[in-house]
Amino acid sequence: MTAHDQSQSSYDVIVVGSGAGAMTSALFAADQGLSVLIVEKSDKYGGTSAISGGGIWIPNNHFFAAIGGQDSPELSMQYLKAATGEHGDPVRLQAYLDHAAPMIKKLTDNSRVRYAVADKYPDYYPQLPGALPGGRTLDPELFDTSLLAEELPNLRKPSPSTLLMGRIAWTARDAHKAMARSFGWQWLIFKLMARYKLDFKWRRKSKYDRRAALGSSLVASLRRSLMDRNVPLWLNTNFEDVLLDGDRVCGIKVATGGKILELKARRGVIFGSGGFEQNQTLREKYLPQPTRASWSATPPGNNTGAALEAGLNIGAATALMDWAWWAPTIAVPGEEKPRGVFAERAFPGAIVVNGLGQRFVNEAAPYLEFVDAMYTDNHKTGGRSVPSWVIFDGHFRFTYAMGPLMPAQVVPDSRLRKEWLNTVYWKADSLEALARQIGVDTQGLSSTVEKVNRYAQTGVDLDFDRGGNVFDRYYGDSNIKPNPCLAPLRKGPFYAMRLDAGDIGTKGGLLTNQHAQVVREDGEPIPGLYAIGNCSASVMGISYPGAGGTLGPAMTFGYIAANHIASGVSATASNKARVLL
């Protein structure tokens, strides 16, 4: 399937990239009778989607309605307008709301992709009008990877942080139950491990679970669905530039197998190849400083902004270039990329401080806002918040995970890799000694911990209201009272881990209209060119409305792009986009 049949050099649609949005667009284009080619620069397919949680934020979805959930287009738009503010384009937002629910219904009805509703996963901004305490995020079901046959080795491996014990598949719903230590969590872990251990035939082939979960499940099920449709996917095929016929994009130039090929696209080219987070030059040009490509939790060598630069060269407009899908990350020696720190920041008994030993943000806040606060505080303190430090005590270490550290009751310090000490984590018998090790103000840290310990007793964080809303509490420990996100730091030894200002992709990119067409500075579409996912400026503006706020729009606008191409509608003035500053 991934062998290059170069006897065909002309297709109706060419898709650049192989993440969830790219493959979704290819699938819907193929289902409307169009010939489709996918090209991928890497030797693996799946992109950042494959290492992600795979969740998609889909308001008014049929899964939620089926269990009696209450949502509406009006409520969803109220929330999105409040979340995106001046950075939101009402026309694009309306297009998203109009097409997201139909997209996932058609996809799950006509492919191997399977989702379930995360009915207790809240929107990220529960304080805003129109927010729901659950039901808009969908979680991929497990997928049997043996169905991929010869394409299995080409699937990008999931991040170790998305697997139980680094090898066992579980859904986001299972992971939440275990992390929140909800009733029955230990029995759940036992069942998952038993299922894995008893699959003797598969374990003789691989140490990884037969089943894919999260983003790996989404990508695997999409790839199998494309195999069912005989849609070719060329790996090791580097996008070089677009081909033009007048002002119309009519194909692409690629490098593969030591050759430069010109591939014609009769109906359209869809950019779905990710952002520019792995391009240090572009990071330094556009993003807040300091910034490092090595801090990004996305695969190194990919997402270097080739589509962005090609679009700029033909007059495309851009927006939101100084924003990313921020997420704090922890570097782990021997791993190709750092790990994002998501749920752990809400666990009780850990705090995050700057170099002054002071807290500067609600640790349980959404990850985009968390890193944004790192940069804001870094500016205020003269460079003392990038990096920041997560601090926890011996009780936390025994009970909870943090980044690559499993709870010590499962993996004690004696079983950790020796090279991790003073690189991944720092350890000392007292807070003062720990502060000196990591270069944090000792008095500042001691005072901060004393204050947090008082807050843990009362259950009220007077500084940042940690645990004060349903989103914070989602990953809190339900057994901890009165606040599931607050516990004292008292029991030595004490630990620290460095948090970098990382990301899971860039947010800015080529500006598009409601049809996913790339537009020029005057808002007019560039004929034949579409962009989705992190190639494009996010429809969500500078907000992150809920889990799956990246993949949901990527897949939805992939669906929109495929439909627009299939319809044969020509560009008109009504297709103008609002240019965001």
Regions found by a protein language model. Give the residues of each.
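A glycine-rich dinucleotide-binding beta-alpha-beta segment and adjacent secondary-structure elements
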Residues: 241, 248, 444-539, 543
